[in-house]
Amino acid sequence: MTAYKPYRHQLRRSLFASTIFPVFLVIIIGLVSFYAIYIWIEHRTIHQHVDESQSSLHHTEKQIQTFITQHNNSFQELDLTNHHDVTATKRELLKLIHQQPATLYYELSGPNQFITNNYEHLNTKNMYLFSTHQLKFKNSTYMLKIYIANTPRLSEIKKDSRQFALIVDQYDNILYANDDRFTIGEKYRPQQFGFMNESVKLNHADHRLIIYKDIHENIEDGITLLIVMAVVLVLLVIFGFISADNMAKRQTKDIETIIQKIYYAKNRHLGTYTPLKNNSELEEINNYIYDLFESNEQLIHSIEHTERRLRDIQLKEIERQFQPHFLFNTMQTIQYLITLSPKLAQTVVQQLSQMLRYSLRTNSHTVELNEELNYIEQYVAIQNIRFDDMIKLHIESSEEARHQTIGKMMLQPLIENAIKHGRDTESLDITIRLTLARQNLHVLVCDNGIGMSSSRLQYVRQSLNNDVFDTKHLGLNHLHNKAMIQYGSHARLHIFSKRNQGTLICYKIPLSRGNVDV
C-alpha cells in the first residue's frame, strides 16, 4: 500500500505558516485600536441598557394603568371610612405593587385618610415619583402616588457594568439617582471628559432617563495589557482556524466527493464507477461503495422480482377461487334448461363461454371498464334465467368513465354479493353508478334487497381484513384483498346496510398508483 502524508502534518504546517504574519499585524493594530474599540463597545452597551431600562419602565407603567382601569369600578364601591373596605383597598394596591418587577411604594391620600406601604418611613424625596392617579371611591376622590425606589434592571446594570442611572426633568433637575455622587434636586451637569452617557425620553412630562459610566476606573495598565493579550490570542486562534479550515477543505475534497456518492447510492443514482481525483487511501472506500452499491442493487431487483411473482400468484389464486363458485351454479342452470328449453340452454352456454374467455384471459390483469360492465351484464342475464327475470340492472356511467382501465373482475363480486345476499321473493333492483373524481373511479352499487342487521354488517366489515386464504367467505373478502394487492392501501371499500332497506357499497379504485386521496 502506498504511504501518504497524514493530513494533520499538512494542517500543522498551515497553522504555523498562516499565524506568523498575523501575530505582528494583530499586535500593532490591537494596541492602536484598543481604546477606540473599548469606547465603541461601552457606547453600544450603554445604548442597549438605556433602551432596556426604558422598555422596563414603560412596561411597568402600562401594567399599573391597566390594573387601575380594570379596578375602577371596584374602587368606586369601596368606602374608605369603613375598616373592611380600607383593608380590601390595601390588599388590592399591594397586589398591584407586588406584580411589578420593581421596588415600588404607594401613597393614597384623601379626606382624613392616608394609606401607604412605606412602613419603614423611607424618604420619598429620594425616590422617583413614577405616576399619579385619581381614584374615585364611594365616599370621595383620593390621590394615588406611586414611587420607584429601584428596579432590578437598573440594579443589575449598576452591579454588572458599573453604569449608573439618572432621571431628570425638562430643566435637568435630578429626580432620581442610584449614584451617591448626585444629589436629588440639583442640576445635572454632564462631564465632558472621562464619562459616557446616553439618554432617552421617559414620558410625556419630558422626563429623561440617563445611563452613564465613569471610564476612568477601567483604564488601568494591568487591565489594558490583559485585554490586549486576550484580543491578540483570540485573533490568533481565529486566524489559525481559518487557515486550517481552508487547508482542510482542500485536503478533504475527496471526502466530500465520497459523501456525495453515498448520497447518490442511497437514492439509487450512483451510476458507473468513477475514480477519485487524488490517489489516496480514500480510493479503497470509493471502491467499496461501488461494490456495495452493485450488491445492493442486485438484492433489490431480486426482492422486487420475488414480490411481483408473489402478487401474480395471489391474483391468480383469487381469480381461480372466483370461478368454481359461479360455474357450479351456472352448470346446474344449464342442466335444468337442457330439458325444458334447449335453445335457452344454448344461449346460456354461449354467454358462459364468453365470460370464461374474459375471466381466463392471462395476458393482462387490467381491462377497460366497458368490458367489465359487459361481463356483468352477461352475468346478470344468466342469473335472471335462474331467477325468472327478477333482477333489474341499471348502469349510470359517463362515456369517459367507461373507457378507464381497472383491474379485471373488480366489479363483478359487488353484483354477485347483491344478488346472493339481497335477493328475496320480490324483484331485486341493482343500480351501478360510476363517477370520476380526482384521479379515482368511484363505484356505488345499491340494491333494494333485504339488507343486513347491524351485527351482520359489523361481521362483514370485520371479515374484509381477514386473509384471503384464511376465510370461507370469498365474495367481498376476495375483492378487498385483490384490491389491496393490485392498488395498495389507496383503494377503499365501504359497506352500508339496514335490515329490509337494502345495501349500499361504495368502492374507490385509484386510476393512478401515486394518488393518495381518501
Curated annotation (Swiss-Prot):
Keywords for this protein: ATP-binding, Cell membrane, Kinase, Membrane, Nucleotide-binding, Phosphoprotein, Transferase, Transmembrane, Transmembrane helix, Two-component regulatory system
Post-translational modification: Autophosphorylated.
Gene Ontology molecular function: ATP binding; phosphorelay sensor kinase activity
Domain Histidine kinase: 297-513
Catalytic activity: ATP + protein L-histidine = ADP + protein N-phospho-L-histidine
Modified residues (Phosphohistidine): 325
Domain of life: Bacteria
Subcellular location, principal: membrane
Cellular compartment(s): Cell membrane
Entry's EC annotation: 2.7.13.3
Transmembrane segments: 20-40, 222-242
Enzyme's top EC category: transferase
GO cellular component: plasma membrane
Membrane topology: Multi-pass membrane protein
Pfam families linked: HATPase_c, His_kinase
Function text: Member of the two-component regulatory system HptS/HptR that regulates genes involved in hexose phosphate transport system in response to changes in extracellular phosphate sources. May act as a sensor protein kinase which is autophosphorylated at a histidine residue and transfers its phosphate group to the conserved aspartic acid residue in the regulatory domain of HptS. In turn, HptS antagonizes CcpA-dependent transcription of a subset of CcpA-regulated genes involved in antibiotic susceptibility.
PANTHER family per the UniProt record, alphabetical: SENSOR HISTIDINE KINASE YPDA, SENSOR PROTEIN KINASE HPTS
Name of the protein in question: Sensor protein kinase HptS
Designated gene of the protein: hptS
